[in-house]
Amino acid sequence: MGRGAGREYSPAATTAENGGGKKKQKEKELDELKKEVAMDDHKLSLDELGRKYQVDLSKGLTNQRAQDVLARDGPNALTPPPTTPEWVKFCRQLFGGFSILLWIGAILCFLAYGIQAAMEDEPSNDNLYLGVVLAAVVIVTGCFSYYQEAKSSKIMDSFKNMVPQQALVIREGEKMQINAEEVVVGDLVEVKGGDRVPADLRIISSHGCKVDNSSLTGESEPQTRSPEFTHENPLETRNICFFSTNCVEGTARGIVIATGDRTVMGRIATLASGLEVGRTPIAMEIEHFIQLITGVAVFLGVSFFVLSLILGYSWLEAVIFLIGIIVANVPEGLLATVTVCLTLTAKRMARKNCLVKNLEAVETLGSTSTICSDKTGTLTQNRMTVAHMWFDNQIHEADTTEDQSGATFDKRSPTWTALSRIAGLCNRAVFKAGQENISVSKRDTAGDASESALLKCIELSCGSVRKMRDRNPKVAEIPFNSTNKYQLSIHEREDSPQSHVLVMKGAPERILDRCSTILVQGKEIPLDKEMQDAFQNAYMELGGLGERVLGFCQLNLPSGKFPRGFKFDTDELNFPTEKLCFVGLMSMIDPPRAAVPDAVGKCRSAGIKVIMVTGDHPITAKAIAKGVGIISEGNETVEDIAARLNIPMSQVNPREAKACVVHGSDLKDMTSEQLDEILKNHTEIVFARTSPQQKLIIVEGCQRQGAIVAVTGDGVNDSPALKKADIGIAMGISGSDVSKQAADMILLDDNFASIVTGVEEGRLIFDNLKKSIAYTLTSNIPEITPFLLFIIANIPLPLGTVTILCIDLGTDMVPAISLAYEAAESDIMKRQPRNSQTDKLVNERLISMAYGQIGMIQALGGFFTYFVILAENGFLPSRLLGIRLDWDDRTMNDLEDSYGQEWTYEQRKVVEFTCHTAFFASIVVVQWADLIICKTRRNSVFQQGMKNKILIFGLLEETALAAFLSYCPGMGVALRMYPLKVTWWFCAFPYSLLIFIYDEVRKLILRRYPGGWVEKETYY
């Protein structure tokens, strides 16, 4: 079985590739898997089958033979998907993406410290501290992200059902229970209602056996299983049962024809684990961002390295400067900020029923431009419900309310009494025990979906069905089978002590053929042409709504011929099944979930295309698509246009039709180009009767258009598509383990509407990360410029390394994280999905705003404070220029200031460190304004308001921390930070105000002139 795959699937790609043979081989194997299942066991006669598997069809295998086959084939279990070892996951967190930048910074710091230690007698330890702190930051955040992902994968593991499955096999003529893993090819296996099918079986005998194939094919109706070969395609034929589907009723015997990975289910699981997964958009964004920052850092570093050499510094000093500038450019706190932002959003989404398995998927959902959604259970409730009935020549809507307040017809009608009696009696579904206190619509039933729907409908409108059945005991029955397409039962009548009533339901046209009269207003009248036309119209109308229609009829058996105690023979029929009395039609549908139409509308206004992909019938699919708004009102398909204009479909220009329903069998014969054509030209698309492999091809088609695709699914059949999509969304309640394994996110309530919440959260996190990064990067400029002036103008160093760390890992952290809590701006779900090519997380405009505009104002504020303090101490700006070498000379203890006072080395250093502290305080003051302007990208702060409590806490926290670092006793020794005069705090205030006013004016122009020059240059 192939594992690993090419990124792009097209038949042409495999031949065109001349790359390594191994890759081609893998692609070829995966293409094989993408093709439909090939097997011929369903075509063999029973004798040929016995010969092929060397098995006696009545006694089963011998124990010896079973052991040999088990040794040859291995246990009957799916190979678990290749998992990443924990240490690899941990290393990825430690060395992936952003961490690399910090590691390089740390190594450069140790290098610089090494050079200084070799050159100087008393080297300063700044670089050593910085290196250690950087390494610590990476390790702590790495552990944090690893813990987060491990936690959500723990939740994943709890989904796996740990019970070892049992299977009933017959070996050497004895029935025995064994673990399903020990079942081998050729085993004779029995399954009954409620069992999971232990392997792929070829049925050799069955009694009313029905299986639920929905996890494999997506069909919600149970499928009949019998020994007859009915279809070329093994997935459609009746005589094959598939591994891990459920048997819902009846019993069957079969020969095992495939086990483990060789089963149809196994092939799909292998296909899913073999697909290569692309990188998440946010990972690419962070990489792009690292390249940008590194570019800026290296450019600055190298230019000042050259400059310092020109200015006459020694090589070694120049290298120290180079390293210093590069490290000053590294935003140390940003890694932690990004991780915390993603984690917070993941937690917030979990509260809204979206469990995110890997943190980066949170953002992917926000950039989604196409959602391919499954129908059954995601858009619909996965609960068949009676929708309409037709009797007395009128269509009535069914009343599904608990208190029957929505009745649309007179319940006293004798025809309705007859119809409800047939629906309740000719019905094998029952409520499971102990649910008397639960509302009827929520109760669990045993029986197939349509019968359960009828049961609930009759229970609601006529009271207890069980009592009705007790009053009319069943004496004979013919279960539904696909040849005669009806179900019949005979009951003793409660209203006459001697006679019986025969009740029948089934496919409407078959039922009508057996009737000669029809019940209208409680009277039997002949079934004439007029009534047949009325029936036909009602049948077509209900069928066109995508509903499953059943016909009902009855016959009161004459008591003379069929007295009580009469032996009805259901094999050799000894009672009439013709000339019955037609009573009415009832139609059922799996109704859309209540919140879905609204959610689809939100997707549309957010520029997201919703495509329905289902295994169900095209008419049903189209009806639901219209019901939930995937096909919006007034939009027509080619068929609709042809019907309206009364012309053949070939004459309609397909481009005129906005909507389109594609049948799986047509999709099979399409080339990639034709599929692309459909995806390009139609805005509203429904794919019906699709196979799992086709789902994958549809996803790849959307990705070829450059879309970011989200796929929802619950069945095993969805797992390849879930894996291939940019974000796979599995269902938490109805989803199979395989689909949960392949997905990136799990909807705990199975509701499509939760996806829209997810999209909003994803867009919000992208916006908020942008804001966080803009905020964090801005303070880089006031941190770097002091260093540059120190080199160029030869002034005493205005801001030290330790104080830079106090900003990046101290005061800036909480405010940066608080932006993750910022509420969405008003246009968040009205924008088009972001284009991953042009709309980057960090773009040139963001860098120019943070570095070139706001950052420069901040730096001015810091230098203003610096020059004020030195001037107050007697060093005017003119005296400072070129003073650096004397200032830093330990032997010089009589340096004169502008007024002729002499300063010792120790005294000078205390003033210098006080300046560091004041510069630090000024940065905190200007970062207040920066934090407030970063709250919004387009709206005014006054529109947005200050509702973000965490942000207000962040403002207070950074101020308190700055004051603590300045005034706490002992800081002078520990971090060389000294207490400041109160007035020095206010030096930067005007600059803070300037930043706020400057940005509010900019945003006003943005809103007044959208698309103008200001937007092009400054909107990040």
Curated annotation (Swiss-Prot):
What are the entry keywords? ATP-binding, Cell membrane, Disease variant, Epilepsy, Intellectual disability, Ion transport, Magnesium, Membrane, Metal-binding, Nucleotide-binding, Phosphoprotein, Potassium, Potassium transport, Sodium, Sodium transport, Sodium/potassium transport, Translocase, Transmembrane, Transmembrane helix, Transport
Assembly behavior:
The sodium/potassium-transporting ATPase is composed of a catalytic alpha subunit, an auxiliary non-catalytic beta subunit and an additional regulatory subunit. Interacts with regulatory subunit FXYD1.
UniProt lists the family membership as follows: Belongs to the cation transport ATPase (P-type) (TC 3.A.3) family. Type IIC subfamily.
Gene3D superfamilies annotated for this entry? Calcium-transporting ATPase, cytoplasmic domain N, Calcium-transporting ATPase, cytoplasmic transduction domain A, Calcium-transporting ATPase, transmembrane domain, HAD superfamily/HAD-like
For whether the record's keyword set contains NADP, the answer is no
Residue ranges spanning the membrane: these are 86-106, 130-150, 287-306, 319-336, 770-789, 800-820, 841-863, 916-935, 949-967, 983-1003
Upper classification of the source organism reads: Eukaryota, Metazoa, Chordata, Craniata, Vertebrata
Query: Per the UniProt record, which EC number(s) apply here?
Result: 7.2.2.13
Q: Which SUPFAM superfamilies match?
A: Calcium ATPase, transduction domain A (SSF81653), Calcium ATPase, transmembrane domain M (SSF81665), HAD-like (SSF56784), Metal cation-transporting ATPase, ATP-binding domain N (SSF81660)
Q: Which stretches of sequence are listed as region Interaction with phosphoinositide-3 kinase?
A: 80-82
Q: Where is the protein situated, by its record's location annotation?
A: Membrane; Cell membrane
Could you tell me which PROSITE patterns the record lists for this protein?
A: ATPASE_E1_E2
Disease annotation reads: Migraine, familial hemiplegic, 2: A subtype of migraine with aura associated with hemiparesis in some families. Migraine is a disabling symptom complex of periodic headaches, usually temporal and unilateral. Headaches are often accompanied by irritability, nausea, vomiting and photophobia, preceded by constriction of the cranial arteries. Migraine with aura is characterized by recurrent attacks of reversible neurological symptoms (aura) that precede or accompany the headache. Alternating hemiplegia of childhood 1: A rare syndrome of episodic hemi- or quadriplegia lasting minutes to days. Most cases are accompanied by dystonic posturing, choreoathetoid movements, nystagmus, other ocular motor abnormalities, autonomic disturbances, and progressive cognitive impairment. It is typically distinguished from familial hemiplegic migraine by infantile onset and high prevalence of associated neurological deficits that become increasingly obvious with age.
UniProt-annotated binding residues for Mg(2+): D714, D718
Residue numbers bearing the Phosphoserine modification: S10, S439, S450, S496, S559, S587, S672, S826, S940
Top-tier EC class: translocase
Q: What is this protein called?
A: Sodium/potassium-transporting ATPase subunit alpha-2
| UniProt-reported outcome of changing G874S | In FHM2; some patients exhibit a clinical overlap between migraine and epilepsy
One biological process term from GO is: response to glycoside
What mutagenesis or variant effect is reported for R908Q?
In DEE98; decreased sodium/potassium-exchanging ATPase activity
> Pfam families under this entry?
Cation_ATPase, Cation_ATPase_C, Cation_ATPase_N, E1-E2_ATPase, Hydrolase
What's the chief localization of this chain? membrane
Molecular function (GO) terms listed?
ATP binding; ATP hydrolysis activity; ATPase-coupled monoatomic cation transmembrane transporter activity; P-type sodium:potassium-exchanging transporter activity; phosphatase activity; potassium ion binding; protein heterodimerization activity; protein-folding chaperone binding
Which residues are part of the propeptide segment? 1-5
